[in-house]
């Protein structure tokens, strides 16, 4: 009964334009929460750095072994693909166009074939399609593991000049948006 009396009095106070002390505290806390929540979110998001690119080693079809860190200072598109992947094969001419459009501006493309793709198939595909960029076979699967354990193809990563992953694409990217993003990254001071 005592609880009912307090509730009834609180209700009467509100109906007569009065607010109890506990009601004022609640309103104050809500107002502060509404003000601080967006600021805390901005601080958190602003403080988050982009994921660093794994410094994977790769061997290109021409036998050159290199590390991804050797491409630092360039905007890089790393594409994990397979010759048996129809989406990969369908997007390859667009990757070629993208590479050709931006290569003279410090842009690099690296196509890494998955470990299950026979090297001879990859070599034949690259030769028959005159791929103008570096092509590697991830025979050990270590490169795919280094990039968040890539299992689906195509999976593509856009990396800025500082070596940070700025975008990840599962499936074929929207190439108009990709081109705009590459142009933006190339225009940024290093």
PLM regions with names:
Residues 4-12:
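Short, charge-rich patches within N-terminal targeting peptides
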Residues 127-132, 139-183:
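Thiol/disulfide oxidoreductase modules built on the thioredoxin-like
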């Amino acid at each position: 009964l005592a609880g009912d009396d307090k509730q009834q009095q609180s209700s009467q106070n509100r109906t007569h334009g009065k607010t109890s002390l506990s009601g004022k505290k609640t309103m104050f806390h809500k107002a502060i929460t509404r003000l601080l929540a967006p600021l805390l979110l901005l601080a958190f998001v602003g403080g988050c750095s982009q994921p660093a690119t794994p410094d994977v080693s790769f061997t290109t079809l021409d036998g050159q072994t290199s590390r991804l860190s050797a491409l630092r200072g360039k905007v890089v598109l790393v594409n994990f693909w397979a010759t048996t992947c129809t989406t990969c094969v369908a997007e390859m001419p667009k990757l070629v166009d993208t590479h050709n459009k931006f290569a003279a501006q410090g842009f690099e493309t690296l196509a890494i074939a998955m470990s299950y793709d026979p090297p001879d198939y990859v070599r034949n595909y690259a030769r028959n399609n005159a791929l103008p960029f570096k092509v590697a076979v991830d025979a050990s699967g270590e490169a795919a593991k280094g990039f968040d354990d890539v299992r689906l193809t195509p999976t593509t990563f856009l990396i800025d000049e500082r070596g940070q992953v700025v975008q990840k694409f599962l499936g074929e990217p929207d190439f108009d948006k990709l081109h705009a993003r590459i142009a933006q990254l190339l225009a940024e001071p290093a």
